[in-house]
Amino acid sequence: MQEPAITPEVIENHGLKPDEYDLILEIIGREPTFTELGIFSAMWNEHCSYKSSKKWLRTLPTSGPQVICGPGENAGIVDIGDGDAVVFKMESHNHPSYIEPYQGAATGVGGILRDVFTMGARPIASMNSLSFGEPAHHKTRQLVNGVVEGVGGYGNCFGVPCVGGEVRFHPAYNGNCLVNAFAAGLVKTDMIFYSAASGVGMPVVYLGAKTGRDGVGGATMASAEFDDTIEEKRPTVQVGDPFTEKRLMEATLELMQTGAVISIQDMGAAGLTCSAVEMGDKGGLGVRLDLEKVPQREENMTAYEMMLSESQERMLMVLKPELEAEAKAVFEKWDLDFAIVGETIAEDRFLIMHNGEVKADLPLSKLSSSAPEYDRPWIEVEAPAALTDADVPTIDPIDGLKALISSPNYAGKQWVYEQYDTTVMGDTARRPGLGGGMVRVHGTDKKLAFTSDVTPRYVKANPVEGGKQAVAEAYRNLCAVGAKPLATTDNLNFGNPEKPEIMGQFVGALKGIGEAVSALDMPIVSGNVSLYNETDGQAILPTPTIGAVGLVAAGEEPILGEARDGHVLLLVGETIGHLGQSALLHEVFNREDGDAPAVDLEIEKRNGEFIRNNRDFIKACTDISDGGLALAAFELAEAAGVGVQIDASDTPTLFGEDQARYLVACNFDQAEALMIAAGQAGVPLETVGKFTGDTVKMGGSEATLEELSQIFRTSFAEAVA
């Protein structure tokens, strides 16, 4: 079959700029074949090369005494003691989920799970951070239902508990939803596997499901803006099979026990191309592939299609040749394909053969580590003016609370997480619903806590403070359950980086994130960048999602209790009443003005340590973020089924979103001891109310807990289900 001619239109359709194509001509000294053009397109797009973000990603703190493996591998790895490690990462599947919600979300879950078990870890927890357009938008309901069903359909069948996440709505996501999937797994520190190939002449083995035409060009599609041709992109969305993935995991983990694996890589974005190139490049080797040996489920597939297919549930491995028979037997037992499709070579070449013909012969290193890198122009985002006294609204406290909990942004998300299996594997210690999730480390007394956080309104208004706040809120959510924060993964979702104002958001957010993870000892060990989240020139809110992991060590107790009638309600931290960019302004007054709240990282660290160090006095705890004191107190009361009385009455005190604050419930006879401890630690602590009865009282306003709970538990489904 004759390959298509290389024309300017073909080059543009592959997402390559004219200067990038000129660079290809310079590198290889000739016109590329169609297959070679596809390979360059896949490896040089934003999704695989990070060409617009790499400069700034290097500024992030990624190391620490607890870090075993930082960015650059399939996932990050952190030591949790006793020969155990946690492996985790967050990654986006935004563009596919907007085009085909169910499969886009499902394969996003599948991809992140493969990243974890490729390292030798058994997945133990998942989360997802979802962003959709306004509820009334004509696509939102379809997207919400499809994405949630896809996340649940894949994760439930695979058998990993969903322990947390977030769901938000904003008109800026009308044209681009965000689906950020997180997974974590456990591995013994002496059984970690990496992707760098080693040894010349070693067999390159294809593992898992067969290759089809689904997902061809998916990575390139994920690196471009949307326009009115979006429906034509549907064939670029992958199709997942969670039962095959489950078998692939079991076979892979069993294979690793044999000692046959030299290196291993999952096939994700750009499929066979990216996995082979990354393995070779990290090992300083070349790779030769014979495509007629690739297991195929469709007839007459071309070299181009096989190299760029993103069919799911596939892996690539470099194998010890003397253990081939043993390795093959493992995969045959699990009814999965096992095929030697090539070998490592000494030369820096990526050589692709198909039926005896050379389809690609390229310098391998130029496809990966030497790919183009841009220093995009950027404009520093000028923070808006702070609210003046005249700008600050007032509202009846209960009316304000009702407005918040009737919005799908702040209503209970039961409709979402009840579709997910949250307890499979039997180690879930805290299910989704309030703050961080938690799982027990099986066979030990240790527990791992997980959270996912970002407030995009803050990041748009003030990227530096918004970036800090995303990390700080993750830190607080871990401290609030008694876990010591260990490390983070970032999922950086932004618009078109070729626009200086968008690049300015990115640069500012990374500056804030970097400062925060350094100050709070939470290095970034893995992550993902998703750019070009725009439709017809309209960008999403900048959404740098932070996933974080914390540890409750053996011998420590987590803070997982509930408030009880008679408990005192105490507020940790200083209240100023900052309403700029607040949930109240947005949901009630349709305003997004004022600056984002300032984040003092020293105070964040001090207050978080105070919570962890005084866990014996604390019966229940939550951090204060969106919705301020009022929403946090209601959520504690609603979770416990007991009323709450709050002494404050003014709007800024009740709904302000000052940072570094927590609400804690404690016994009346222990409140004084907690006050003394706070004084010794230099931490502001004040009594702001008590848990009692069956009503929620704020100032002179009140409503029954039953009425408010009904609103809280039904509003989400009524809006979007």
Curated annotation (Swiss-Prot):
Q: Which cellular component terms (GO) are annotated to the entry?
A: cytoplasm
Where do the annotations place Mg(2+) 2 binding? 115, 266
Question: Which residues does the entry assign to the active site, renumbered to this chain?
Answer: 47, 93 (proton acceptor)
Q: Which residues bind ATP?
A: 50, 89, 490, 527
Q: In which pathway does it act?
A: Purine metabolism; IMP biosynthesis via de novo pathway; 5-amino-1-(5-phospho-D-ribosyl)imidazole from N(2)-formyl-N(1)-(5-phospho-D-ribosyl)glycinamide: step 1/2
Annotated residues that bind Mg(2+) 1 are located at 91, 528
Which InterPro entries does the entry link to?
PRibForGlyAmidine_synth_PurL, PurL_linker, PurM-like_C_dom, PurM-like_C_sf, PurM-like_N, PurM-like_N_sf
Task: List keywords of the entry alphabetically.
Answer: ATP-binding, Cytoplasm, Ligase, Magnesium, Metal-binding, Nucleotide-binding, Purine biosynthesis
Compartments reported by the entry: Cytoplasm
Enzyme kind, highest EC tier: ligase
- Cite a single GO MF annotation: ATP binding
* Entries under CDD domains matching the protein: PurL_repeat1 (cd02203), PurL_repeat2 (cd02204)
Residues holding substrate: 92-95, 114, 238, 310-312, 530
Note whether RNA-binding occurs among the keywords.
Answer: no
Q: Give one GO biological process term.
A: 'de novo' IMP biosynthetic process
Has UniProt tagged this entry with the keyword Magnesium? Answer: yes
- Entry's EC annotation: 6.3.5.3
As its record notes, the protein acts as a catalyst of: N(2)-formyl-N(1)-(5-phospho-beta-D-ribosyl)glycinamide + L-glutamine + ATP + H2O = 2-formamido-N(1)-(5-O-phospho-beta-D-ribosyl)acetamidine + L-glutamate + ADP + phosphate + H(+)
Q: Which Pfam families match?
A: AIRS, AIRS_C, FGAR-AT_linker
* Function field: Part of the phosphoribosylformylglycinamidine synthase complex involved in the purines biosynthetic pathway. Catalyzes the ATP-dependent conversion of formylglycinamide ribonucleotide (FGAR) and glutamine to yield formylglycinamidine ribonucleotide (FGAM) and glutamate. The FGAM synthase complex is composed of three subunits. PurQ produces an ammonia molecule by converting glutamine to glutamate. PurL transfers the ammonia molecule to FGAR to form FGAM in an ATP-dependent manner.
- Oligomeric state and partners? Monomer. Part of the FGAM synthase complex composed of 1 PurL, 1 PurQ and 2 PurS subunits.
Q: Which HAMAP family match?
A: PurL_2
Question: Which family does the record claim for this protein?
Answer: Belongs to the FGAMS family.
The protein's name in its UniProt record? Phosphoribosylformylglycinamidine synthase subunit PurL
